[in-house]
Amino acid sequence: MEFLLGNPFSTPVGQCLEKATDGSLQSEDWTLNMEICDIINETEEGPKDAIRALKKRLNGNRNYREVMLALTVLETCVKNCGHRFHILVANRDFIDSVLVKIISPKNNPPTIVQDKVLALIQAWADAFRSSPDLTGVVHIYEELKRKGVEFPMADLDALSPIHTPQRSVPEVDPAATMPRSQSQQRTSAGSYSSPPPAPYSAPQAPALSVTGPITANSEQIARLRSELDVVRGNTKVMSEMLTEMVPGQEDSSDLELLQELNRTCRAMQQRIVELISRVSNEEVTEELLHVNDDLNNVFLRYERFERYRSGRSVQNASNGVLNEVTEDNLIDLGPGSPAVVSPMVGNTAPPSSLSSQLAGLDLGTESVSGTLSSLQQCNPRDGFDMFAQTRGNSLAEQRKTVTYEDPQAVGGLASALDNRKQSSEGIPVAQPSVMDDIEVWLRTDLKGDDLEEGVTSEEFDKFLEERAKAAEMVPDLPSPPMEAPAPASNPSGRKKPERSEDALFAL
């Protein structure tokens, strides 16, 4: 491939890159680094030639001093060059075949090199995540995280996206190095900035590690505070929404906005927690702690809101099911239960009492099938509602109000129950007059017998006959008043079955 395309270091940008990554340099040559950026931006083949030269310097190079210088040049070009160069750098092939290959276990690079490569991949993944044509590095970053690779803590520059500043100083004679060095210091990466006018005094290679504390300058502190203002604004909006919204009655659009704010604030909190342990400025650390406390408070309120909202939805669903089941099937056995007077009872026909259902049974049928057919005519729903309505009353109280408008129902088993009950209740009313008549009869009958000393068998038989005749002369007992008129006439042939039924219940 090199035979066809030529030596990558033979191009103008390749020559500058070879000089800027020479292992004999004591520090980064920012003049050459910025010249490389200018060539990439101004020439058509500059981005491709620069990528070829970087691959040549990075692949299989065991001189990690040159590797660190090449990574510095690569980072500077990404921050100062345009979209044409970004497409080539964020390509999955370049990230996987060059950068990931450097930190592979078989190469066993130093920790400083590993941290540098991982920091670049992480920063580019965050910066290019929203660009559809620059997501190759994002995929590599996600794959490495799934494999368990631990990335270093992000520095302050990760809070702002990578951008390409405009060229600040036109190209001048190389002899005039002072203005050019100042422009280079302004456009280079913040972590490599050096105080003027020391010629190109940049941090040495060991200082490139991103694991130490961060000493932010005034520009970085100002940018950080502007970012914290955004976080405070999001926190305030989220807090106001939680105050106004009622769990279970929120609007769908408001709920969606609240959930989006929660995700955004949680992502911001991760960065803030990372910076708290890294920033050495006490004032900035105090501000970060205050913002973190505000975020924690609003997160607690949001979690409480979500619990109430989910609990309210579950409660409404369960209440709907319970209401439906209670209306149809349940019977509350407590006093004053609404199930006793159910609104459904008024919509149906009055439930028949137990005695009226028994009246429908034909005791004259001798077959079991006839009895079963009589039972099947009864609606189980009516019996169920009747039980729900009359659970507080005894069977005897229910029989008081039973009336029979059908003469045929009198001959049933229910009529025997009712007649027996009514007869037992009616006897005490007429009992005093009957007993008086019997006592008068006994007194008149026994007046002449008080002086007799003995009674013969003939006289005793005669006495029994007279008593039997007197018993036949006793008038019938008056029947108690009934709510409905009794049948006009009852067949005399039914007296014996009624008496037999009375005897049956007496047993």
Curated annotation (Swiss-Prot):
One of its GO terms (biological process) is protein transport. Residues 20-152 form the VHS domain. GO terms for cellular component: endosome; extracellular exosome; membrane. It holds the Pfam family GAT. One of its GO terms (molecular function) is phosphatidylinositol binding. The GAT domain mediates interaction with TOLLIP. This is TOM1-like protein 2.
